[in-house]
């Protein structure tokens, strides 16, 4: 970049680090000029303040916004909209490839206007990590990794060819090929610079790294003091084309950490307990910033585990300030010493180093590390904490089977059995202490002659290659393999619904006896239907506990007092006999890990091997769509979109497509796992000649809108109150009352010209960022969602697709109104113009003509979001914005 730096507020200052001179926009200088106290500002908000200051000269940031944020006690700052400019965008392939497809369709639309399609190009750096597509088809053998990788490349050749095309077209795109790890762990260990630089003529500008990530676990990088959170691909598109992301200045809740952990307590135990505490405290949409004396007892990987689960405790971010542990971790993971020196010098100059007096928080939640004991969470929510002795009762309460623990020895599959046990997820495989502990426990168990029960499908899918290199160096790989935990891939796998098939005999036994069987994962979420269609529930646990429960084989074993099994000498083996001491774990870890281990394993990150580099791909600036492809189809979101903005009208005579309860997840709305043969998406694939064995997953087919719209609200565990007593994607078509699939009902309503809404309870859209939960909603013809409350990312995604989110007033709900789905609904006031926080009148009319009127809060939160909805979504908004400026002609000869 060669443009000179603007300095309208006279805050540009030099910073000498070694032999290099940088410049930076000084927060202390700004605070002095405004007469504000920088030390009162939470550290996360200091990073945001610098972002606003750096863009104060480009016309997107008002001086009043800077002043309001800097005066942290000013009443107008909280909830105010500011323009945030992320330094980069991070995306996994699950949401990244659909975004690349959206960009390809935008190029088509721009080219149709006579403009150069290459004008559609990312304006800021974007990293795409391919991690969501690999499945655990093969497990339990030393060649499982190679076989799963071969299957992945074969299944996804069409999808990956899109990525190869995009790599040729988009200069700002960096791609991490398959089989390298999970996006958030790679971001933590390698990609994140913490402080980044850009050159402006002779000046080298230093500023904090920041990002938006197209996955709800993006806040994992908050552990490094990096400002970033999860958004949908819909919203990320605006950042990629160079527009700021509209951000409401959040509530910042301090979490004061004290004490030290008890012996044998893993960080998984800490984060699951903390998730329950923060959910109870209520931090929805807030930034949780950690401080206090207990931070000294948390390693950077511990902090990353805690920050990773911000979405699970409902926060936008889980932020840790930079401190000495941050600098130690950067050095330990092989970062350049000059970069580590820059991070320290910059953080000190900008008052971004933690450890001093606590800033001013909206409120403080106390958390004592010493109060934590080993726990699990489940069977369907991450905040459902349960201690080891209480696990059998938790299962019986959830599934009411009356099951009892089975005797040891050969037997039939039973209620409470664990059929999938997986050490997976960036949440915990990024934590070396926990992985070494799992390896030591497995080694100890193998030495006693124990192994996983035969009905348990075991797998190990770490988030980076460093993990397996560390286990090899520690001599622990063989022990894990002896229990059954062979490497199956580097990717999300079981955590994201890619657990692969169960053996036919297991599946048949589950179906025959209607068994409530379970999964045991070292993961971050366990929503219904996510892991496997045959698995009724999932418990989250630390990696060593996953190994232990694979050996026990059932959640009806109380591992706090019952043995895991019997050794070769006939002696009972208890968990305490196998559990390694903290001192042993620390010693083994210290000998196995080094900065060079990280450097070696990240040296060839972008290579990909011949299976990747040899993929055929087009070279033209517009993508060559294959009309016969069932993986890649041109999306319809710009079909019929012209230069003229259509008017917004009131909604009259709309029908509810679904009537849903509380805590509807984006997995319920848009499942990511295997596509069932009897579902509308499966029937579509069958009709197009695809055998059920080749259906793959919804994640893999996200670039085919025909599959995805049929998969919307098709989760096998979703419960629509319009069809009482049933599970799955069914609804009642009105007024005839016929029970049909959600997709079929939507088709019938569209043919009749009937508008649609969804009515739901509290916490609607929690879970994954999953933009297809909003895209599918829009493609079904749903104009609005009426709920008691919304989770942050899904609310934003709905707005980004032109769907209006409306909240019932406090004390009013579908139940208090007695709604049953037979009503018609009018939404009045929309035609008067969309405004943030406006009131919309909802009128519910029963079949007998009786009507109730309710004032609804329109959850369009910012003026920018109102623009998106007026345009019918972000993509039409970006398209119209591009064609409204001076056109970029197609180059001669193109």
Task: Pin down the residues of each PLM region.
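Extracellular/luminal Protease-associated
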Residues: 258, 291-298, 524, 746-747, ...
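Acidic, glycine-rich flexible loop/linker segments
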Residues: 567-584, 795-868
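N-terminal amphipathic, basic-rich helices that act as targeting or association modules
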Residues: 2-151, 298-336, 627-670, 675-676, ...
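Long, structured ligand/cofactor-binding scaffold of large enzymes
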Residues: 57-257, 269-272, 374-377, 396-485, ...
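Terminal amphipathic helices with adjacent charged low-complexity linkers/tails
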Residues: 85, 103-158, 289, 295-402, ...
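Conserved short loop/turn motifs at secondary-structure junctions
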Residues: 91-96, 290-297, 316, 325-333, ...
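Mobile "lid/hinge" segments at catalytic clefts and subdomain interfaces of large enzymes
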Residues: 200-347, 353, 437, 442-454, ...
